[in-house]
Amino acid sequence: MARSAPAFSSFTAGEISPRLEGRTNIEKYREGLSDLTNMVVMPHGGVTRRPGTEYLGEIADSSVKSRLIPFQFKTSDTYILEFGNQTMRVLRNDLQVLNSTTRTITGATKANPVVITTSGAHGYSNGDEVYIDSAGGMTEINGRNYLVAGVTSTTFQLTDLFGSNVDGTNFTTYTSGGTVNEIYEISTVYTEAQLFDLRFAQSADTMYIVHPSHPVKTLTRTDHNAWTFANLTINENGPPTLTSSNNYPSVVSFFEQRLVFGATNNNPQTLWFSKNGDYGNFHTGTNDDDALIYTIASNQVNAIRFLSATRVLTVGTSGGEYVLTSTNDGPVTPTTTLIRKYSNYGTAQIEPVQVADVTLFVQRGKRKIREFKFVGDVNTGGYSAPDMTILAEHVTEGGIVQMAFQQEPDSVVWCVRDDGTLLGLTYRREEEVVAWHKHVIGGTFSSGQAVVESIATLPTDTGEDELFMIVKRTINSVTKRYIEKMKVFDFGDDATTAFFVDSGLSYSGSATTTLSGLYHLEGETLQVLGNGATHPDETVSSGGITLDYSSTKAAVGFGYDSTMQTLRIESGSVDGTSQGKPKR
């Protein structure tokens, strides 16, 4: 039997469909894999294990879904907005933002439950979530979130986020000081069922938010813990109008210094462009900078599903994809607006992502991601929308419900599948890299896998964009939804800093066998990485674990398996293909 030593040097096709098993004639076959789970394809062709996720905090109400929305003033001043059922919270620098009013602690009892006394009236109500820090003596209560109970004007009892009393009978004695503050939270009009239909566009410190059941809202930031919702004042001379029931827009974007709305219930194919630079002015006219209204003419009523602004305005509808430009290659004006249809795939009601000058959108059936891009030369070219899942149709089974783009370090489009599986698409078209990989987040929900419900990304100045997610699990027999951030592990990083656990926390300090602060994983059996090496699993009790041997650096959280399997090798044979022939 002839010897063969095939080299697998690149995996830029990622995981490919079982339907292509043995299809060695396909160009991407040698770069494909039959399974790639919890591994990320790098643009250079190699693969690396997915880093774990760091626990940042619990959402406002774990009994209902929430959605994460990014807010970026500049790359060094960014926030994650947690929209819940008629609530909004804020994360900055991986921490939940607190109210501006801080109360001073004057007492903490060694009792069950611990009773906190403040220097004056605290103003809290039963069930409010607070954060305690810097208490002297009774350091066990520091750096944690609590729900308050048994409220009087200057005292309250501590319960944990599972609703159980915090037993302080074995804590060290309180001596002095400490602060308590409430988690910053404001009310919104948006219910749980409406959250994933919200669309938004941001200019500086103001975000414009639309939903077909509500008037257009502005969300304005004046400080880390000072955010204000208001109705946008719209000056218009319609019809069609934007300011009454069934006439509220469902999509929004900025384009050529205009605020653009689209798709009301009464006018699903209509676009409204504000006056240039005056975002509340929709008073139409014939001057070049006047507002304008444009209705797409078609044989069918296909509602507008998304707007994507690059050099042109891409308009995705339920029946096809359009490009809006000017008739004279100048700015769009009331007299020069031109819209052309380029494809008939139809789009799902899911926000697309922009990668360079390309718009990636989810097709109407939610199984395909298409790449809407310009092809050809300037004079005779047009737009096409090839299928990015053609070699891996199986990875999107069940449908995609959300997307987010992480530009650095590896140019990955992240997707949430309907069953809560996280999908990744390493996408670098200029290098012909289109590689799918799937990710099962550690932990369980009910009797199945942990469920990813929302994702968002933020840019940074450090060269590593950040991916945030909400993960639903069953923790200590209770449904919990946690906000987590995927960590980063680069080539050359010290193995002792490896973070390959989910919903985890890390420790760095003097050698210890006792790790605390794991209250969010109470009762769960966790994986431990100590000084870069695996450690026997430990179960959390009273928020802590005891290690079998001391560590100066540790990461603790849910473990997960990373798997990679090649396709059947095509190494050739003396009489043709090696497929179907005995091997040893």
Regions found by a protein language model. Give the residues of each.
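Beta-propeller domains
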Residues: 40, 78-99, 262-290, 324-334
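Surface-exposed loop/turn positions within WD40 beta-propeller blades
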Residues: 85, 204, 213, 224, ...
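Surface-exposed acidic, glycine/proline-enriched linker/cap segments
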Residues: 182, 238-242, 281-299, 380-397
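Beta-sheet repeat architectures centered on beta-propellers
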Residues: 2-102, 185-197, 202, 299-304, ...
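Short, surface-exposed terminal/edge motifs of secreted or surface/virion proteins that either
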Residues: 80-93, 154-164, 211-233, 266-273, ...
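Beta-sheet-rich non-transmembrane sensory/scaffold domains
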Residues: 244-245, 269-297, 341-350
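Catalytic or ion-translocation cores adjacent to nucleophile or general acid/base/metal-coordination motifs
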Residues: 329-367
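Small/polar beta-strand repeat architecture
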Residues: 2-23, 27, 95-202, 210-215, ...
